[in-house]
Amino acid sequence: MNNPQRAVRPKERGRMPGISRRDLLYSGLALSASTLVARSAWGQTVALMASHPGLASAEALEAIAPREQLLFDFGWKFQFGHGTDPARDLGFGNSQGDFAKTGEFEFSKGKFDDSKWRKLNLPHDWAVELPFVWDDVQNSHGFKPVGRRYPETSVGWYRREFDIPASDKDRRIWVEFDGAFRSVLVFVNGCFIGRNDNGYAPFRFDLTDFLAVGAKNYIVVRVDASFGDGWFYEGAGIYRHVWLTKTDPLHLGRWESTVRSTVSGSGATLALGTIVENQGKNIESAKVSWKIVDASGKTVATAETPAQSIAVDGAATFSATAKLANPALWSVDEPNLYSAIVTVESGGKARDAERVSFGVRTAIFDAEKGFSLNGKSLKIQGTCNHQDHAGVGAALPDRLQWFRLAVLREMGGNAVRTSHNMPTPEWVEACDRMGMMMMCETRQMSSSAEGLSQLETMVKRYRNSPSIILWSIGNEEWVMQSEEAEQGAKVGATMVRKCHELDPTRVVSAAVNGDNEKGVSDAFDIIGFNYNLKGPEGYHKEHPKRPLYGSETSSAISTRGVYSTDALRNTVNAYDSVVPWGETAEDWWKFYGGNDYEAGGFAWTGFDYRGEPTPYGWPSINSQFGIVDMCGFPKDTFYYYKAWWGKDPVVHVFPHWNFEGREGEEIPVWVYSNMDEVELFVNGQSAGRQKVPHLGHVQWKVKYAPGAIEARGSKGGTVLLTDKRETTGPAVAIKLIADRTEINADGEDVAVIKVEALDKEGRAVPTANNHLGFKVSGAGAFIGVGNGDPNCQESDKEPKRSLFNGLAQVIVQATKEPGEIHIEAAKEGWDGPVLTPAKLTITTKKVELRPAVLDK
């Protein structure tokens, strides 16, 4: 955490390892053979750490007696309901009196027959399983049949049996959802428990009074995705984790434990706080203690409070301070983390405890100097990202969150924006552990009770995370900036005030596509601009004391592996094209990266995403804004950012050199590089040497002839790096490459497999589009496939896929039994030449499973 004073500095105001093996194994990122990140300095660090002994995955949610938090993901059953026909919706809503009496919902009792329901584990997104439909109204959500006009595929029911042992007789028990899309009704043992109408904020229900102790219990969750929260693909169903949490009646309040650090000289002061609630039958005398533990497990500080008396159904606030000598600061290069073990004691014993992860750091936004972290100037090199991925939709396994962040980190990114909603906890935790800063954004910009509730949930949930450097209360709320600017100013002020009340350590802002002269912007600590590079330049002249950053920039568009725009095929060339309101990668970064007063910014977007197909409509089913595609395969612009954001030398030449039939035509050849000079060779002959402009690129026009193009980058007259593209032959074989060849046998971990086609020389064929089939057997299961083609309407859930410009991706998930996962890939169909099939084996190792509700 940073200084308790909000980290804004207008003009008038003024020995530990970085990422540990423990952190990597926490989410299964330890790499035995990674083709994704091994090339970068960060990737080399990951690979090095992977060679050291690690920790079992269960320690990710280590139980601290007597509290239990049990994963509630396994062993569910699912069936579609219906949005308008009660007869096809378990009879729900057939009578106006459904809610008249408690305990009468038969579908959540033991006698109900669910034998024909589909068995599945969570997280689950049913929208990604549905076919595509040509519907202009649905284009922003990815042309999936979800919404009020599709009642037969917009409601889903989840059901599960579970045991509550007799030992839980005197405990409080909650079911906790990290997120479900969108409108949720929960029933337990025939009783209606509660509802939630937001697709992103976590929610929970106290089940204590409704459970049969020492017996079987039944929970049913109805999820209705008829309405959306955004204008992008959002999925449908219980797409995040579910937990069953058990505590003593005297327990810590949810998300009430805070650790706020103030760095001074070589030390830091920790302001510790929490709230204890008493849901027992008697008045309790309780005290709270803190134990601060570093990454090695060593206790480095302690604190304790005097006892307080807490009334029945009452609560008490506890606070203390602790000192850290020579703290290991959290930074993007060394994301050092500490844990605070918070314990409630009463009657001579521990009644409740929890572990709170935090970091010590100081983040400052300055009106003249931009952004600094721990006193060092640092540009925010960020991307905006939605939360879906090829093959799995919105239901991302935890490991895939780390995979996606690793792609962005490999590019040189050091920050992400959670566009446009509260993120999943695993994304935030991965950012904490990887050293990725974050702009954390709420979905609904409103000072209504519902809007403030969502905002409060987000801030409380994540205010201890060092990766978060600013809160965002909204995105492009142009009505609140224009005709309702008066109301917008009041809404913005109320939301900013709520953020400051809950977390006085961070700045508050929003992504604004107006002039920031009125409306919601009045109350912001720092000013964010979406696009319009003249806007922030003029604003800075008029308001030189307000810190600025690019909240959303670029909107460059391209199709991976495509080098000529074709409106009939819905493809865009890779030469840094933009939409009318956007800027090229070079233009936006020259402005935000080149002006000292700008803190940096967030490019739209890191990954391609489903829905909002831009610049084309049907049959395009996802956007083409990404710097990488839906699978995480880099587009050429990736290497512009890698050159100017990263620390490693870069030379990247493009396009590929397979242009049969275009002999003699001029082909633009570009090179992204951070070298002093680049010389281009065409079939062994020099086409000239060029100096590389700062934050720019070099380019030539070359008459195509089969052979090779090669770029040689030099510094100080010495060639340091080369990159080459050769004309390949036709594809003759398939190759499979896993991001890891060993994963955890925990029922959750995944391996991400790159599929490519090779010619007879073993070279990747960049134009191959063969249709392949996949077979997965052994100790794992196929869970999804993709290829990064924005126009591909093949199923993400069938084990077959066409290569797109030479690539596809398969995702497999481990079972809980250690062994081997066998993946096979072969060409499907009789068209074209035969391809040599490929096989790959992934080992799944036995690990201690994290605590979970037993799978029936």
Question: Where in the sequence are the language-model features?
Answer:
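N-terminal secretory signal peptides
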Residues: M1-I19, A30-A33
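Beta-strand-rich structural segments
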Residues: L272-V276, V669-Y672, R712, E748-P766, ...
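N-terminal twin-arginine translocation
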Residues: P17-Y26, L31-A60
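An acidic-aromatic loop/edge-strand motif
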Residues: F143-V146, D197-G199, F205-L272, V276, ...
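Extended substrate-binding grooves/exosites of carbohydrate-active enzymes
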Residues: F74, L90, N94-F105, C191, ...
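Extended carbohydrate-recognition surfaces in non-catalytic/accessory domains of CAZymes
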Residues: L48-E176, D229, G235-I238, L250, ...
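Accessory beta-strand-rich segments of carbohydrate-active enzymes
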Residues: E129, R148-W255, Q279-G280, V293, ...
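Short S/T/G/P-enriched beta-strand
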Residues: F365, G646-P668, E679, T722, ...
